[in-house]
Amino acid sequence: MRATVRVTALVSALLLFAISFSQSSYASDTRSSHGDHASRFSTIFKSPTHKPKPLAATVSPTSGCVKTNATPHNPIKVGNPDQGNAILDRVFTLNSNCGPIIFKAFGKKAVFTVIAMSFLAKSGYFDHSLCHRVTTAGIFVLQCGDPTASGSGGPPFTYRDENLPGNAPNNYPAGTIAMANSGPGTNGSQFFIVYKDSHLPPSYTIWGLVTQGLDIVKRVAAAGIVGGGNDGTPKMTIAIESVSVD
């Protein structure tokens, strides 16, 4: 009888501990979504669950662009962005083999995104990487930022969505720079450039606007897709050779 009572008491104690631990974890997660940017920085950048998968490909020059030696490759190793970086509007220049694409980044509206993308750019993460996807019907975007060119590559951290638009017609107008993701809070390095007004689910962080070079993206889209169709690898090879941030 005494043994039964002791076992029952032990089980009750374990259940109370489990409930207490679960509530404590939830409270910690909730707190991480409040407060100033610096205090949240250590929790906002989380390790992704996917692993980059290199993709073999043959790259050839196309009229209008110079030859590139960029090929799919494993991303360089990077740490986490520096929380001390100033949160300011910045100008990114994508130096591509087809010419420069310049855009203003919205550092005040998309704080974590601009800090993260500036960090990756300055680390050389995007250097010699291929823009791996273009769409030509329904939505009109060129997708870049994945060194593996597989659509699954990314840095060793993710961060939350910011500056999302409403669900209005053409909520992603031409010239928009937005983050690609695989669900809420999974932003990494992949981004897309909208070359024609498009309507998408309001789930993709808008963090910049093209000021020069949108004609290059339109030219890449007009060249079509490898194997045909309206969504796939650009027939006109375009690579980001380097990125400068001012």
Pin down the residues of each PLM region:
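Cyclophilin-like peptidyl-prolyl cis-trans isomerases
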Residues: 6-7, 17-246
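Bacterial N-terminal signal peptides that target proteins for export
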Residues: 1-10
